[in-house]
């Protein structure tokens, strides 16, 4: 797999915001789709996987509607539901995000998130306790924390939540 192609696609001047954007440094949709086509051609012929990777890259570049359309195609799939939840979290449609996270049950991505987020949250034991009760990632608590940061109740945590 040519990971560097995907790293380039995710390179932006700032992390994605907690809300829908827009922000500077993101690619235009048509150019981004061409770049995603080229990168995916090298790594997989699995349409579902390709589509979901595309949805996540489009979402990273603040193309929420295009990402949402793709995620909706895979609503009955755990990976598709997880992507769908992330899209709704960014919109922000918090209750819908929680619905889709509940549908995914205990998605395998949550173990990876717990490990990586744990490193980032080391300096904030309170937030760590909220997002990772008993050491496991809680996607619904993450949605709640993002909502609180977005409405100004926890602005000091916004940057940490963006990186997570």
PLM region spans:
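TPR repeat positional signature
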Residues: 51, 81-84, 88
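Structural register within alpha-helical repeat arrays
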Residues: 54-55, 84, 96
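Extended hydrophobic/aromatic segments used for targeting, binding, or gating
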Residues: 78-79, 95
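Conserved alpha-helical segments that form or flank metal/cofactor-binding pockets of metalloenzymes
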Residues: 93-100
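Hydrophobic alpha-helical segments, chiefly the membrane-spanning helices
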Residues: 160-164
């Amino acid at each position: 797999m040519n990971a560097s192609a995907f790293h380039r696609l995710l390179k932006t001047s700032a992390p994605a915001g907690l809300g829908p954007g827009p922000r500077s440094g993101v690619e235009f949709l048509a150019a981004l789709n061409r770049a995603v086509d080229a990168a995916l051609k090298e790594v997989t012929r699995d349409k579902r996987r390709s589509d979901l990777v595309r949805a996540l890259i489009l979402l990273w570049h603040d193309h929420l509607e295009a990402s949402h359309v793709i995620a909706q195609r895979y609503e009955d799939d755990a990976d598709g539901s997880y992507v769908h939840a992330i899209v709704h979290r960014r919109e922000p449609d918090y209750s819908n995000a929680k619905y889709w996270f509940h549908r995914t049950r205990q998605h395998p991505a949550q173990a990876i998130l717990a490990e990586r987020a744990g490193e980032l949250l080391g300096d904030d034991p309170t937030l760590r306790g909220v997002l990772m009760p008993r050491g496991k990632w809680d996607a619904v608590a993450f949605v709640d924390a993002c909502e609180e940061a977005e409405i100004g109740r926890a602005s000091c945590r916004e940057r940490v939540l963006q990186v997570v």
